[in-house]
């Protein structure tokens, strides 16, 4: 009898392994390495992981002629184009977060050793989700990401941070339990955990198993709904984003959200693309998310809570892309996630740079910002305009693509609602933007002092990204719109 060994090629795992090594180095060396050295090392690990993505894509000069394997462990891990694209967005968000942390973590009273280690573990989980080829790997990545994120939310020694972390843990745990329960139903209906196997079974499913499949699908949708803050599973978002350190809020609203949508795209855009029932339910949830997210944001005075409800509204736009064709929807989602990461990092990096404590800036605190920090005021105004979807910024084209996907898929009411919600968003985005350029002889708040070179680099990169991708959207969309990127989404 011949012993058949599983495929254990490490090449598809290289981006994940490099970040994991960074996490281990932070864990072991965080208590004796200087704080800037530790963060600089993690930045190098993230850049190395990004370089490995380029190598796996085949775009690196040293990779010419090399036969690079695309999967490992019998397809459980897949380095397909969609994984590389979404993984690159995850790494970009992590890189910008680390840059901002160099200048602002000490003010937030956050331990560099703990912050860097937990962040790198969370990024490891995020990459596992993007590279997953079956439900087990996706679930492992999701739990690694979630557990590290729960602790990150509590890192600051304050009651608000502890409360935020507890709420995030409780509601996130419920979401994970629902998701696991749903995955069990999917396995019961299809008899496989592999995305490609599930897609094949769904297309030729025994009628007796349709009820089990629909139940599992709706449970999985609900579990992911908690992770991405889809209404009515969004209740944790404003409290966690406003109570956690701004650095952590930045990470949760970008990297974690990108990874969660990568998982949703794998499951609903690949394995369950032909599954029954979930499109109608997701349509209703998207409508609720657009309405409630924008309506709640109109009444916020705390700037981070405003951005939290804004994130809920953007979740609605991001989820709209899942309603359409996998190739078109995947391209729109890939573009939107990159743009959303840049916009959100830019806005929250400015907040992190300005605030002296973690009590949070109010909208009135923005009055007269231009006369004290003109560069930050202009950068924040550009980010808010892009979040609102105003041309010529990249946020306009991102929202346009999401609406186009829904419209061409036949969801006319959702498309109209998305347009109306974009108009409503102008009110709460432009209010702080206008206050920043109004003179104020008696400022309500004293901003933080000192040089913030790393944060300035992160803000500048974000600003350049949203302007260039707005003026020349095909620089990114023309690439991600290739059907070949999304053809292998289910692992087929």
UniProtKB/Swiss-Prot annotation:
Record-given protein name: NADH-quinone oxidoreductase subunit N
Its biological purpose: NDH-1 shuttles electrons from NADH, via FMN and iron-sulfur (Fe-S) centers, to quinones in the respiratory chain. The immediate electron acceptor for the enzyme in this species is believed to be a menaquinone. Couples the redox reaction to proton translocation (for every two electrons transferred, four hydrogen ions are translocated across the cytoplasmic membrane), and thus conserves the redox energy in a proton gradient.
Q: Where does it primarily localize? A: membrane
**UniProt membrane topology term:** Multi-pass membrane protein
Quaternary structure annotation from Swiss-Prot or TrEMBL: NDH-1 is composed of 15 different subunits. Subunits NuoA, H, J, K, L, M, N constitute the membrane sector of the complex.
Documented EC number(s): 7.1.1.-
Organism, by scientific name, is Deinococcus radiodurans (strain ATCC 13939 / DSM 20539 / JCM 16871 / CCUG 27074 / LMG 4051 / NBRC 15346 / NCIMB 9279 / VKM B-1422 / R1)
* Keyword set, alphabetical order: Cell membrane, Membrane, NAD, Quinone, Translocase, Transmembrane, Transmembrane helix, Transport
């Amino acid at each position: 009898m011949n012993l058949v060994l599983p495929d254990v090629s490490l090449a598809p795992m290289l981006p994940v392994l490099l970040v994991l090594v960074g996490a281990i180095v932070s864990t072991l060396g965080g208590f004796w390495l200087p704080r800037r050295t530790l963060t600089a090392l993690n930045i190098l690990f993230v850049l190395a992981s990004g370089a490995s993505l380029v190598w796996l894509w085949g775009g690196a000069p040293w990779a010419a002629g090399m036969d690079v394997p695309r999967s490992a462990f019998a397809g459980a891990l897949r380095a397909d184009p969609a994984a590389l694209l979404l993984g690159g967005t995850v790494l970009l968000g992590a890189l910008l977060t680390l840059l901002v942390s160099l200048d602002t973590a000490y003010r937030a009273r956050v331990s560099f050793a703990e912050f860097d280690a937990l962040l790198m573990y969370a990024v490891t989980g995020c990459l596992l989700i993007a590279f997953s080829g079956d439900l087990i790997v996706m679930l492992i990545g999701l739990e690694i990401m979630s557990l590290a994120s729960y602790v990150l939310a509590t890192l600051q020694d304050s009651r608000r941070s502890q409360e935020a972390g507890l709420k995030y843990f409780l509601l996130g745990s419920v979401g994970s339990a629902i998701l696991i329960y749903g995955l069990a139903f999917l396995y019961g209906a299809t008899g496989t955990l592999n995305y490609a196997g599930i897609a094949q079974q769904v297309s030729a499913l025994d009628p007796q198993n349709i009820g089990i499949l629909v139940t599992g699908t709706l449970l999985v949708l609900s579990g992911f709904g908690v992770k991405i803050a889809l209404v009515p599973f969004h209740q944790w978002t404003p409290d966690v984003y406003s109570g956690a350190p701004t650095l952590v809020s930045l990470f949760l609203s970008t990297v974690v959200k990108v990874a969660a949508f990568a998982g949703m795209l794998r499951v609903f855009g690949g394995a369950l693309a032909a599954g029954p029932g979930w499109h109608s339910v997701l349509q209703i949830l998207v409508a609720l998310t657009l309405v409630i997210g924008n309506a709640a944001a109109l009444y916020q005075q705390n700037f981070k809570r405003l951005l939290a409800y804004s994130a809920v509204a953007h979740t609605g736009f991001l989820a709209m892309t899942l309603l359409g064709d996998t190739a078109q929807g995947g391209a729109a989602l890939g573009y939107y996630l990159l743009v959303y990461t840049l916009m959100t990092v830019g806005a929250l990096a400015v907040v992190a740079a300005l605030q002296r404590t973690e009590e949070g800036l109010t909208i009135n605190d923005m009055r007269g910002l231009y006369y004290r920090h003109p560069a930050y005021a202009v950068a924040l105004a550009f980010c808010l305009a892009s979040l609102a979807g105003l041309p010529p910024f990249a946020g306009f084209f991102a929202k346009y693509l999401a609406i186009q996907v829904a419209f061409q898929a036949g969801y006319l009411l959702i498309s109209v609602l998305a347009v109306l919600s974009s108009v409503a968003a102008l009110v709460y985005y432009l209010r702080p933007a206008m206050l920043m350029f109004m003179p104020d002889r008696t400022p309500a708040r004293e901003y933080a002092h000192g040089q913030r070179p790393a944060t300035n680099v992160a803000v500048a990169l974000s600003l350049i990204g949203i302007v260039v991708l707005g003026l020349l959207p095909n620089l990114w969309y023309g690439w991600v719109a290739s059907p070949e990127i999304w053809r292998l989404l289910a692992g087929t």
